[in-house]
Amino acid sequence: MSGKVFVDGAIIAKRNLIKIKRVPDLLVFSTLSPIMFILLFAYVFGSAIDVPGQSYREFLIPGIFAQTVIFGATITGAGLADDIQKGIIDRFRSLPISRSAVLVGRTGSDVVNNVLVIVIMSVTGLIVGWRIRSSVPEAIAGFLLLLAFAYAISWIMAWVGLLVPSPEVVNNASFMIIFPLTFIANTFVPTNNFPAVLKAIANWNPVSSVTQAARNLFGNTSDKAKTPGAWSLEHPELYTLGWVVVILVVFIPLSVRQYKRAASR
């Protein structure tokens, strides 16, 4: 991609962020759900869930982070589908900007949105008893890894948003895919007691690896709660980065190609 793509992309990203400023409900509702999950699991279910060797709340919060940024990526697909439906993409075609810039701006603005959501969730987590036990560089690496994974997922959602006819379909399709992925994982409970088949799926689920990587980097881990024998969870940072690279390599070209088709309809 040339430098012009990123300059134009920054302009598109600013346009998307201004929309959040003008309609703050978008940010409010994107944070209400994870806050409710934190409060529900911390105060209602948390007393019934035992994580060997550590506080359940410290085990839980990184999982909520992972779930939230992944669900937040659906905004990318829904936003693009909405722009197509309202004819905004046709207006972009008339401007002297790179076609790829629309996608770069859309995914970039959603990273900023995820940063805001993570900040709000972190404050909520600190209130309910979550603590970062690692060093500052490790904690920053944990947040960056979560954002990198969310950025990769946003390109999948961008491709989906350019394929389907409306934002509603994007939301329904992404819910059907992402919801099972975030629950057949170690987001809320360790996978040690899962049935054999589900345990194998959960251990190699990239959602589990990004969650475990975040726990490691935040210092929210316990040897007793770790899953032995699964390379993906013994080296979650590498496994997650591998998924990020593969997703970007595959879905950036697919999304750009699909955008060109959508823009030429």
Set out the residue ranges of the language-model regions.
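Alpha-helical transmembrane segments and their short interhelical loops
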Residues: 99-174, 235-255
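Pore- or pathway-lining transmembrane helices of multi-pass membrane proteins that form conduits
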Residues: 28-32, 166-186
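Hydrophobic alpha-helical transmembrane segments of multi-pass membrane transport proteins
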Residues: 36-41, 57-128, 149, 157, ...
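Short hydrophobic, aromatic-rich alpha-helical segments embedded in or entering the lipid bilayer
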Residues: 6-12, 183-229, 237-238
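Short helix-capping/hinge motifs at transmembrane helix termini and TM-loop junctions
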Residues: 41-50, 128-133, 137, 164-166, ...
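Alpha-helical transmembrane segments of multi-pass membrane transporters/translocases
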Residues: 38, 42, 215-265
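Aromatic- and glycine-rich beta-strand/loop motifs that create alpha-glucan
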Residues: 1-33
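Transmembrane helix-loop junction
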Residues: 42-47, 82, 91, 126, ...
